[in-house]
């Protein structure tokens, strides 16, 4: 908060809760899977109460901002009444600490008679099937457009967008377009705005932190423009995109690895002979996407190689073990390994 950024923490309950059931298996649901908390066990409520108390109470609480998110998405619809009771209970539980509470839309999918607190509650409107935006506003909820069809990024997954369609968002989307079937009028009271979401569903698939940033920065730019200005027919998307590429990420920040101007290295296109311990470095700490690296490897008789083949800030690439059995592996800053399907050659064979 001291830097002017409100980080909204989320403890995702009662589904998507494997982190808790790994620690405490007895509160997991035998019927619906261990990613669901068992809503019929008293121990579940004792555990969640103590967890929230730990993060929200005391002289130095962990959650210091004004808002806290409690998840509540994608619980099994067969338990609608119990889910609604659980949700209502923890909306009130968080509020007693003086926090504004947020939740994912679920009450269209989990219809029922059990009332769920609406005052001072903000809902992420993420799916037509799960939330009725008009009914939610009528009941007194505030909503944020987080429509999965338009605003979800799930890198390299195949079932949601890998990159947002920034051109379509700039030219066609508006914050009232809460899902493909429903649209709210401009200026609808209770519609606070919109946001995109990134879900890294697949770990170890070769997608690095930089890869995620490469996807999210253009999304942040176009949504910021739409939130502040709305539709702008005076500036084409092509002009807007050109301006975006000229804008830095922040003072002194270059996570995209942009290189200004054309770089020509002396001695390019010339053959260089190394003695086995040499290294070559450029004046550039990194080069962002799009880029390509081409090189050849012609190993000598020594087969035991364990070292970095080439590296930038993120990630280094290295052969592991003996050359003939090795693969190129990418190692990120958080030590996740991803394998590139290229075997290094034996002595006397060239690799390119």
Where are these regions (language model features)?
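Hydrophobic faces of well-ordered beta-strands that scaffold small-molecule active sites
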Residues: 3, 7-11, 66-70, 101-103, ...
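Trp-centered recognition loops
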Residues: 340-352
